[in-house]
Amino acid sequence: KPGMPKSLPCSAASNADPKSYATQPVETILTNIIGNKNILDYCVSHKEITKMILTSSFEVYGELNGQDIYSENMSGMIDQTILRNGYPESKRCCELLVRSYVEEFGINAVIARLPSVYGPTMLRSDSKAHAQFIRNALNGENIILKSKGDQRRTYCYVVDAASAIFKILSAGKNGEIYNISNEKSVASIAEVAKMCAEIAGTTVVFDLPDEIEEKGFSRSKNCILDNTKLRKLGWNGKFTLRDGLTETLAYLKDE
């Protein structure tokens, strides 16, 4: 495609679900940091690599008291005494490592901060709340909510996420960070549960989390990503949250 670099490594492999954060904290941290370093070293030694991208996470923002909308220059507190925070801390380290390689070795790299991405390609073992809601809905079961669900999040259908990543690769400025966010897909966890139940014709019920589930919970209240920088590159999301959830369930039912 015109405008796209020829060789495009993408640093994306990671434990990316709360259960893994709680039960495999060492693997989560090392996969992020060492895996990312290996890709960066490859970029340095292979001059045909024209650009690489790191897929980071909204979790790097930590807790920003009094802030609901997060732009790329913000940074909040992450409690290092909580094991599940090995994920956001290691993602922060990866971001700094990428920018350091850009400065010291002159590679061309960009960073994408992803929101809560969903779609039919999610792992069946994914323990994130919205992934569990989708599995419940797919099986015709009641949607189980294990908290008040009042935290508001930015969600993104996988098709929109993929197109945003390609836009950042093709048009993003070297060393810059870009939030991936679709303003049509902002909702509370409870609203996502209700939407899944409505699409599937089931009901939302409340249950207590078990010990491992509770250890994996994020402590941040609201996290709505500001997509101003990404929109300036010419990108806009196509899918509303309801449309994306409907497509996800329809696709999985046809498998």
Feature map (PLM): residue ranges:
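N-terminal Rossmann-like NAD(P)+-binding domain of SDR-like oxidoreductases, especially those catalyzing
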Residues: 1-115, 247
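Residues that form or flank phosphate/diphosphate-binding pockets in enzymes
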Residues: 16, 47, 62, 124, ...
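A short acidic, helix-capping loop that chelates divalent metal ions and anchors anionic groups
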Residues: 18-22, 119-120, 213-215
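Short, solvent-exposed loop/turn segments at secondary-structure boundaries
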Residues: 23-24, 121-125, 218-219
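Asparagine-centered polar/low-complexity signal
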Residues: 31-32, 36-38, 116, 136, ...
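NAD(P)-dependent short-chain dehydrogenase/reductase
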Residues: 64-73, 96-154, 158-169, 189, ...
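C-terminal substrate-binding subdomain of Rossmann-fold SDR/epimerase-dehydratase oxidoreductases
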Residues: 137-255
